[in-house]
Amino acid sequence: MDINSFNRVGANIRKAGFLIVLFYLLVVLIMKFLEANNFFGYSFSMLSNDIFAPPSLNHFCGTDRLGRDVCLRTLQGSSLAIEVVFLAILFSLSLGLPLGLLSGYFGGFFDKCLSLIMDTIFSIPVILLSVVVAFVLGKGILNAALALCIVYSPQYFRLIRNQTILVKSETYVEAAQVSGADVKTIIFKYILPNVITPLPILLTLNAADAVLVLGSLGFLGLGVPADVPEWGSDLNLALACLLYTSPSPRDKRQSRMPSSA
């Protein structure tokens, strides 16, 4: 197999990944549009639907013990996951990027203090730290995003700081300093464009990990309110059925859809 064949395989893999991500984003956008028009208002009623109903044309994956449509609730949970993850990554980037730039450029005591704080936060396991922060802040979409923000901010800080330390020693930066350019110009014109290139990779990794952490918080009852469709809380509800009743096909069906998502 020659180099061109490898390139074609790599291109096909990238296209497949792009199509998968595009499909999920399309589903999320459709669900948000339908939610905005109150299309799913009926799915939350415990009186209109039978509990533990089997799959049918009306309920593709059946209903749970509260009479809610499992399939629709899982799809609605996808829009919530994207919303919380987007806010968390945005907050983390907004905090870690400027602090990393300033710390890496100025150095000294300021750099040591920030690095110590961020390294301390980074040393704590992600799940443990997110659980503690979510417990302190309480339930809510914004609080869940803030909990994830505190968890992931040190990663952006460390990445940008290390890149800034490398870039500020380059010849063009030193030339700008000698020519009398102010700090703002040096940071935003010469350093920032050259330190953000690794960010898309970290953003992708954190987004995937944040979905798992959000599900863990919901499973422990520390994420969003119980009435909001969320994968972790739905799995917790399904687990209660499996533990306290005989695991019948209807109980397995209730947990299969959120776990596969």
What annotation goes with each model-predicted range?
Residues 60-64, 95, 104-110, 114-166, ...:
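Generic hydrophobic transmembrane alpha-helix motif, especially the helices
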